[in-house]
Amino acid sequence: MSDVSGKVNLLNFDHKSMREYLESIGEKPFRADQIMKWIYHFGYSDFEQMTNINKKLREKLQRNCIISAPDISEKQVSEDGTIKYALKLEGGQEVETVWIPENDRATLCVSSQVGCALECTFCATAQQGFNRNLSMAEIIGQVWRVANDIGATRIAGTRPITNIVMMGMGEPLLNMKNLIPALDTMLNDLGYGLSKRRVTVSTSGVVPALDMLKAKIDCALAISIHAPNNKLRDELVPINKKYPLEDFIAAAGRYIEGSKANKQATIEYVMLDHVNDSTDQAHELAHALKGLPSKINLIPFNPYPGSPYSRSSNSRIDRFDKVLQSYGLTVITRRTRGEDIDAACGQLAGDVFDRTKRSVINAAKNAEISSLKNQPKADTISIKVV
């Protein structure tokens, strides 16, 4: 829970653990409620600004605690108003977060990991490989940092963050330990107070974790399918070899059963030209989804350097859409946002990968140089930078 300063980062606590921490240092648990309001409603990180907390406690917090979110290392604004943030983490790694304003809402796309281990062949993040899970502070800190940057605290009263989607870098369900308390803070009235239907977790098919999520928290669900059968999905989404499509769809059905956040699951389907976009495949997809209450988001593929795929033509997308609608399915073709700054779906990584890789290599070199200085002269040391 501590950062490099040795202080406890309060962004690593949800409401329950914040109360437990305050009790552990001899304070009344209601103080946690006050502190959370200052952090998330006002966007404060300075304990001296928390004026309804007595001076003695403020001084104790100042000595032992910190409110630390990832810093903005780069900010790019798209022609359509979308903003992509590169946020710097401890250790020099970076993740990307995207704020997408629309007429009646503003959605924040949040990352859960540095890189991703699932190796989906059409996704830029997957090409980066997996580095590590984000801490709770690094997940909720993305929301806190962007909210402060755009002035979207409750007190400011400006354009708020109305929706959060866990659709950034990484597979959220492979970081359950830190995802759950972060989601709780997004939903809790002492945190961001969003409704269950406005916080969405997207998964590519970690079936056991999806069942665990149901037992832990109720929020909106999006499932990334991208293929109508196991043969093609094995190629596009390799985790399908472990958890086949029919098991994934069944798990989604179990999740939305009894859910107050979901009347239906959102199906994410990236449109790859002449790969998964034929009318025959549309029929096959409709049959695969039979029995699952769902709406389908068709996502035009967003190209990135080195990708072997192309975006489906509008005519192929339209034909695919019409076939699905003929089965009575609700279908939406997602409008691509932030493409000019590589902030669109499937594009997150880019320069962040290059900077992260350089920072890791430099850190490794510095560590090896330091160890060399501390070794006896007679020793022979082999240095290998990965």
From Swiss-Prot:
<keyword id="KW-0479">Metal-binding</keyword>
<feature type="active site" description="Proton acceptor">
    <location>
        <position position="96"/>
    </location>
</feature>
<keyword id="KW-0808">Transferase</keyword>
<dbReference type="GO" id="GO:0030488">
    <property type="term" value="P:tRNA methylation"/>
</dbReference>
<feature type="binding site">
    <location>
        <position position="120"/>
    </location>
    <ligand>
        <name>[4Fe-4S] cluster</name>
    </ligand>
</feature>
<dbReference type="Pfam" id="PF04055">
    <property type="entry name" value="Radical_SAM"/>
</dbReference>
<feature type="binding site">
    <location>
        <position position="123"/>
    </location>
    <ligand>
        <name>[4Fe-4S] cluster</name>
    </ligand>
</feature>
<feature type="binding site">
    <location>
        <position position="116"/>
    </location>
    <ligand>
        <name>[4Fe-4S] cluster</name>
    </ligand>
</feature>
<keyword id="KW-0949">S-adenosyl-L-methionine</keyword>
<feature type="binding site">
    <location>
        <begin position="224"/>
        <end position="226"/>
    </location>
    <ligand>
        <name>S-adenosyl-L-methionine</name>
    </ligand>
</feature>
<dbReference type="GO" id="GO:0002935">
    <property type="term" value="F:tRNA (adenine(37)-C2)-methyltransferase activity"/>
</dbReference>
<keyword id="KW-0489">Methyltransferase</keyword>
<dbReference type="InterPro" id="IPR027492">
    <property type="entry name" value="RNA_MTrfase_RlmN"/>
</dbReference>
<dbReference type="GO" id="GO:0070475">
    <property type="term" value="P:rRNA base methylation"/>
</dbReference>
<dbReference type="GO" id="GO:0005737">
    <property type="term" value="C:cytoplasm"/>
</dbReference>
<dbReference type="GO" id="GO:0000049">
    <property type="term" value="F:tRNA binding"/>
</dbReference>
<dbReference type="InterPro" id="IPR040072">
    <property type="entry name" value="Methyltransferase_A"/>
</dbReference>
<feature type="disulfide bond" description="(transient)">
    <location>
        <begin position="109"/>
        <end position="345"/>
    </location>
</feature>
<dbReference type="GO" id="GO:0070040">
    <property type="term" value="F:rRNA (adenine(2503)-C2-)-methyltransferase activity"/>
</dbReference>
<dbReference type="InterPro" id="IPR013785">
    <property type="entry name" value="Aldolase_TIM"/>
</dbReference>
<keyword id="KW-0411">Iron-sulfur</keyword>
<feature type="binding site">
    <location>
        <position position="202"/>
    </location>
    <ligand>
        <name>S-adenosyl-L-methionine</name>
    </ligand>
</feature>
<dbReference type="InterPro" id="IPR004383">
    <property type="entry name" value="rRNA_lsu_MTrfase_RlmN/Cfr"/>
</dbReference>
<keyword id="KW-0963">Cytoplasm</keyword>
<comment type="function">
    <text>Specifically methylates position 2 of adenine 2503 in 23S rRNA and position 2 of adenine 37 in tRNAs. m2A2503 modification seems to play a crucial role in the proofreading step occurring at the peptidyl transferase center and thus would serve to optimize ribosomal fidelity.</text>
</comment>
<feature type="domain" description="Radical SAM core">
    <location>
        <begin position="102"/>
        <end position="340"/>
    </location>
</feature>
<keyword id="KW-0819">tRNA processing</keyword>
<dbReference type="GO" id="GO:0051539">
    <property type="term" value="F:4 iron, 4 sulfur cluster binding"/>
</dbReference>
<feature type="binding site">
    <location>
        <begin position="170"/>
        <end position="171"/>
    </location>
    <ligand>
        <name>S-adenosyl-L-methionine</name>
    </ligand>
</feature>
<keyword id="KW-0408">Iron</keyword>
<keyword id="KW-0698">rRNA processing</keyword>
<feature type="active site" description="S-methylcysteine intermediate">
    <location>
        <position position="345"/>
    </location>
</feature>
<dbReference type="GO" id="GO:0019843">
    <property type="term" value="F:rRNA binding"/>
</dbReference>
<dbReference type="GO" id="GO:0046872">
    <property type="term" value="F:metal ion binding"/>
</dbReference>
<keyword id="KW-0004">4Fe-4S</keyword>
<protein>
    <recommendedName>
        <fullName>Dual-specificity RNA methyltransferase RlmN</fullName>
        <ecNumber>2.1.1.192</ecNumber>
    </recommendedName>
</protein>
<comment type="similarity">
    <text>Belongs to the radical SAM superfamily. RlmN family.</text>
</comment>
<feature type="binding site">
    <location>
        <position position="302"/>
    </location>
    <ligand>
        <name>S-adenosyl-L-methionine</name>
    </ligand>
</feature>
<dbReference type="InterPro" id="IPR007197">
    <property type="entry name" value="rSAM"/>
</dbReference>
<dbReference type="Pfam" id="PF21016">
    <property type="entry name" value="RlmN_N"/>
</dbReference>
<dbReference type="InterPro" id="IPR048641">
    <property type="entry name" value="RlmN_N"/>
</dbReference>
<keyword id="KW-1015">Disulfide bond</keyword>
